[in-house]
Amino acid sequence: MKLALISAFGVGGATIAGVIIGFLFRKVPHKFNDAILGFAAGIMLSAAILGLIIPSLEEGNVWVTSVGILVGAIFLNLADKLTPHLHHITGMDQEAHADRQNHLNKVMLFVMAIAIHNLPEGIAAGVGFGSENINNAITVALGIALQNIPEGMIIVSPLIMAGVAKKRVFFIACFTGVIEIIGTMIGFGTVSVAKAILPFALAFAGGTMIYVVSDEMIPETHSHRYERMATYSLLAGFITMLVMDFYIG
């Protein structure tokens, strides 16, 4: 429980750390942003497979795992219908903003999108610790935390462009981080109480992470003509997580 709580604050705090970096480097070049986000996508994809999907297969069977992955993806697909895709917002240029009210409307949608996507990521980290396999849990939590840093960085620019005060931007970032902490404790608590759902819960969490990588992160990294670099960055992130998991395990 103590380790899960520490991890929860670490995962949520990584988003805030990213926001602080975003304040320091407000105008991050698309090339650099795509490389960092691609690297984070690779880490997240590797963590989902190594820390969630493979353990789900070991705890259950291929059918439970397959259904869990699919249900996790469908869950986020339904959530996406309530919020805009992150790459539709983070890639906006100033000339695309019609007026201040339009800015603020998009900001609120942006915050909702981040929060909704952070909840299942937090649940994924919590489910990992609920499985009592600490090595796999650390792999997942570390992968999510590393992914949250560039995600926190990209929160800053759209909010400032919309005219939101710096203090309020920081408060909003804290809110999205708290959502992830709550998600971690929900995942840990649910699996701890009902061990029978562990294989499904692991696969569900893995499915949500893969969906985020495919539906949000990869399109964002491929939207500024740096696709090749983003692809190699993703591979680098995947391999990095693979090596880290090998030594952690």
Could you tell me what each predicted segment is?
Residues 1-249:
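Intrinsically disordered, metal-sensing/regulatory segments
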